[in-house]
Amino acid sequence: MVLQLRLSLLRKVGFGAFALTVISAPPAHGQSTFASMGGAWSGNGMVHLRGGTQERIRCRASYDPSSSGQSLKLELRCASDAWNFDLSGSVVQNGNSISGTWFESVNRVGGRITGQYNGGLMEARAEGDIVAALLTVRTMGARQSFLMEAPGAWAEHVSIDLHR
């Protein structure tokens, strides 16, 4: 029973972990890390589930950077035809490193994210008690794309394109 509960939670959390990638974009030339991300974003993508099935997903994000641009609060909602989740989080930038926390309220799970950025590319690791995912994020003006790889999780591969 405990194993089944953990597997069910892992399936749900595996997808939720990717969402934090959106909050960790690197700075544009001459701008602080998160200042250019403020506002509302939306977009679509695909989630590849364990077992080989795929689903289209829709996401909406709201970002609130601090006045210094060195920290960011977010809210993110994503849904497919079969499920949805509601994520909140915060991230802080320190030199080339980023770190933060996230909480997904539908499944009541959370964790940490850590990583680094270089130019327009961010690479990070999102972790919770029972999930880990590798994340790659590119931000280019009013467009953002990201990729999550979480082998063994319910959502093993997620790709999403967002725009303002």
Label every model-predicted segment.
Residues 13-16, 32, 144:
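Short non-domain terminal segments
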Residues 1-4, 142, 164:
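Generic preference for hydrophobic/aromatic residues in regular secondary structure cores
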Residues 26-30:
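Sec/Tat signal peptide C-region and signal peptidase I cleavage site
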Residues 31-140, 147-164:
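Central antiparallel beta-sheet cores of small beta-barrel/beta-sandwich binding domains
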Residues 2-15:
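Bacterial N-terminal signal peptides that target proteins for export
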Residues 12-24:
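Bacterial N-terminal signal peptides
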